[in-house]
Regions:
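S-adenosyl-L-methionine
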Residues: 1-65, 80-83
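SAM cofactor-binding core of SAM-dependent methyltransferases
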Residues: 71-117
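Active-site capping/gating segments
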Residues: 166-207
Length: 207
């Protein structure tokens, strides 16, 4: 099955990512699995990828704002989420330090690291992100300070906070993010696919 997946490469993985996935399939981890592994299992069952499931969820929320200017932070190399939303008619700009414009089908592209202390969100109405890792706290702080609507699915493992400390586990990290939001955001749990439950941090107002 992995050979068929590698040939189809539905999630546009690099050769290294495909090689790492094959190794993980042959030698599964006992505690955690990679996002690529989850998408592989979804594919073998004929189910949508995580990006497609999150895009479907977000698009229903964004339908209330058909002309909104949307920024996806942490879109990755191929900006799959942004492209799916653009195909649905939304006005999307994609941002990531590794985004490759040859994959983005002409979408506005910003190749940069997102930093809440320097990034001006005035050109955008809504910010979205899917598991943006170290950018998570930056997105939260930027949207709070600049009063922007946002939807962000969270990684299932903790990431360093801006001051450099590392939370002990995902729950401690989520609690920290809610404390930083100071009432601006709330955390919800969603079943976007049959395999996992996804934590989504969102602004309380707007959507």
């Amino acid at each position: 099955m992995i050979q068929l997946y590698k040939k189809a490469n539905p999630n546009e993985l690099t050769q290294k990512e495909l090689s790492d996935l094959e190794k993980e399939i042959k030698n599964p981890k006992s505690d955690t699995v990679s996002d690529q592994f989850v998408d592989f299992i979804l594919w073998t069952r004929g189910l949508p990828s995580r990006q497609k499931s999150f895009a479907e969820f977000v698009s229903k929320k964004l339908a209330k704002f058909p002309n909104a200017r949307i920024l996806e932070v942490g879109c990755g190399r191929t900006a799959i989420l942004s492209r799916i939303l653009a195909d649905k008619g939304f006005n999307v700009t994609c941002l990531d330090k590794i985004v490759d414009a040859k994959f983005t089908n002409g979408l506005p592209t910003i190749r940069a690291t997102f930093d809440y202390r320097t990034f001006d969100l005035s050109d955008y109405d809504i910010v979205i992100a899917q598991e943006p890792c170290d950018a998570t706290e930056h997105i939260l702080r930027a949207c709070k300070e600049q009063n922007k609507i946002f939807y962000m699915s969270l990684c299932g493992v903790p990431h360093k906070i801006i001051d450099g400390d590392m939370p002990k586990n995902y729950q401690e990290w989520y609690d920290y993010l809610l404390k930083v939001s100071d009432g601006y955001a709330k955390l919800i749990w969603l079943s976007l696919d049959p395999l996992t439950r996804t934590a989504v941090l969102k602004s309380k107002a707007g959507l």
